[in-house]
Amino acid sequence: MNLFRKYKHKDGFTRLVQPGEMGMRLVDFGLLNLKDGRSFKEDTGKNEVVLVILSGRCRIASGGEEWHAVGGRKNVFEGRPYSVYIPSDSEYTVIGSGDVELAVCKAPADSKRKARLITPEDTNVLSRGRDNWYRDVYEIAGLKKDTEALIVGETISGPGNWCSYPPHKHDLEEAYFFKVNPEQGFGIQRVYTDDRKLDELYVIETNTVVAIPEGYHPLVAAPGYSVWFIYVLAAGQNQVLEAHNDPVHNWLANAKKE
């Protein structure tokens, strides 16, 4: 099963992951690129949506609310993001304030919440792992904090470091969208199950996406390059997020620090 796709930059919205493809049933993910003054309008339907500004600024309106000059990062490696939550059965409009790139994250939900701006200060900053599997995590939304079903965040792994390690799974659908710094760099992503009915290995580069319908999903950044990715999970109405380590490698969780 192919779980990999490469995004080719273009103006407007590009859907990269959707239900019915790559083993996915719930997660819907795409990229929105707008020039100054250009707009994009959408009805969320039965999905709730989290818009994450990856770079640039924009104006976003929904549910009688309007936020101006949202964003400001030059790129995803420069600090925490601005994001906006949009509930199901709502319309929203995005207008570029200069060039802007957004991640559009969706999952089915019966949401009664209101549209809301999520500032960098609202994100939860975590440092996970140790040794050469240390990474920084920005928890943007989820676990009943801002959403009903979606869990969205960003992770940055330093040169030569591993993520999602020791290898673990969540028993939830996920999608990862990547950027690498410097841009010509790369990393490696593996997705596999205990019985190896699913066992895929991909070279991840800037603007690539990997769908994770199930299984363990460790990844590593090549030496000399940092890997950033946005993660999108569909947790369902219960929003239970548990990490289950691969039993073969679980000894690492209790090993002495190097």
Residue locations for each model-derived region?
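Glycine- and acidic-residue-biased ligand/ion/polar-headgroup-sensing regions
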Residues: 45-68, 86, 171-208, 220
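Extended, compositionally biased flexible segments
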Residues: 29-95
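Conserved metal-binding segment of the jelly-roll/cupin
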Residues: 77-97, 107, 203-224, 233
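Double-stranded beta-helix
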Residues: 100-138, 192-193, 230-258
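Non-transmembrane, aqueous-exposed alpha-helical and coiled segments at domain scale
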Residues: 4-5
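Short, structured patches in soluble enzyme cores that scaffold and shape functional sites
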Residues: 88, 96, 104-108, 141-142, ...
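Short glycine/proline-enriched turns and hinge-like loops at secondary-structure junctions
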Residues: 44-45, 96-98, 169-170, 222-225
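A short glycine-rich, His/Asp/Glu-containing loop-to-beta-strand
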Residues: 9-41, 131-175, 186
